[in-house]
Amino acid sequence: MTSTSTTTNGDSFTVKAGLAQMLKGGVIMDVTTPAEARIAEEAGACAVMALERIPSDIRAAGGVARMSNPSMIKEIQAAVTIPVMAKARIGHVTECRILEQLGVDYIDESEVLTPADDTYHVQKDQFKAPFVCGCRNLGEALRRIKEGAAMIRTKGEAGTGDVVEAVKHIRTVNAEIAQAKAALASGGELAVAKMAREIGADVELLKKTAELGRLPVVNFAAGGVATPADAALMMEFGCDGVFVGSGIFKDAKTPEHALQRARAVVKAVANWNDYGALVEACIEHGEAMKGISNAGMKPEERMAGRGW
C-alpha cells in the first residue's frame, strides 16, 4: 500500500515513462565498481545498476542490506556515460531522496534490499526521478504504477541464477492481462471493475492495460537471469529488456571473461528470436555461475515475497 493518496501527476509521469521507453530492447547490468561499469558500457549495456554487493553476495552475507554508499555511486556515475540506477529499500523515502539528490537516472525500490517499511511502499509520484519496481503479478505491477513507477520488472529470485521464478512472474502477468482483456470484451467496465477489486488494482489502470494488451509502462525481466538463453527466453515471453545481476561478474575469471559474458547477453537480447545468433552467444558466454536452485530454498530465504 502507499503512504499517501495523492494522484499521479500526468505530465511528469509521461516524461518518466518516456525515458524508460528509451531502454527497450536493452540489458541493464549490476555493477559494484567503476571498472565493472566500464565493462558493462563497453559490452553494450543500456544502463547499469550501482550497488555495493551483487544479489548473490547479499544472500551469502545475510544481515541487513541497505542503500549503497553515495561515494561508490558517484564513482560509477563518473565512470560511464550510460544511465546509472541505484537501489533503495522498500518504503525508505529518505534513501530515495538521497539517491535523487545524487542525480541517479532511475531509483529501484527493491526487494533485494531489506525492507524498511512492512506496510507502505514509497509514493513515487512525489519524486522527479523515475522509479523501477518489481512485481510477481498484475496486481503488484499496477499498484506500483499507481504509486508512480515508470518501469516494472519481474521480481524473480535475485542472486540465484535460477530463472524459474522470473518465468513464473512474467507468465502470471501475461495471463492476468489476457484475463483483463477478456473481461473488458465480455463484460465491459463492470467486469474490469470486479477484476480490479479482486487483484487490488486501480480500475482505470486495469482498463488501460486491457485495452493495450500489455502494461502501460516498460516491463523488464529480472531475478535469476544468468545466461544468454535465459535472457532470450524472457524476451520470448514479451519482456521489453533484461536486468542481469550476478550472472555477469560472479565467478568471472578475468575482466576479459566478464566482458565476454556481458557481450553475449547483450547479443542474445538483441537477437532473441535468431537461434543461430543465440548459439553463438551461448558459446561466447561460456560457463555460467553455479547458482542456487529455487526448489531447495526456505521461505525466509526468498526475496520475491518482500513487498505487497
Curated annotation (Swiss-Prot):
It comes from the Eukaryota. InterPro entries: Aldolase_TIM, PdxS/SNZ, PdxS/SNZ_N, RibuloseP-bd_barrel. The keyword Acyltransferase does not apply. The keyword Lyase applies. Signal peptide: none annotated. CDD domains: pdxS. The active site is at K87 (schiff-base intermediate with d-ribose 5-phosphate). It is an enzyme of class 4 (lyase). Keywords: Lyase, Pyridoxal phosphate, Schiff base. Its EC number is 4.3.3.6. It catalyses: aldehydo-D-ribose 5-phosphate + D-glyceraldehyde 3-phosphate + L-glutamine = pyridoxal 5'-phosphate + L-glutamate + phosphate + 3 H2O + H(+). PANTHER family: PYRIDOXAL 5'-PHOSPHATE SYNTHASE SUBUNIT SNZ1-RELATED. HAMAP family: PdxS. Catalyzes the formation of pyridoxal 5'-phosphate from ribose 5-phosphate (RBP), glyceraldehyde 3-phosphate (G3P) and ammonia. The ammonia is provided by pdx-2. Can also use ribulose 5-phosphate and dihydroxyacetone phosphate as substrates, resulting from enzyme-catalyzed isomerization of RBP and G3P, respectively. Also plays an indirect role in resistance to singlet oxygen-generating photosensitizers. Belongs to the PdxS/SNZ family. This is Probable pyridoxal 5'-phosphate synthase subunit pdx-1. It comes from Neurospora crassa (strain ATCC 24698 / 74-OR23-1A / CBS 708.71 / DSM 1257 / FGSC 987). The lineage of its organism: Eukaryota, Fungi, Dikarya, Ascomycota, Pezizomycotina. The gene is pdx-1.
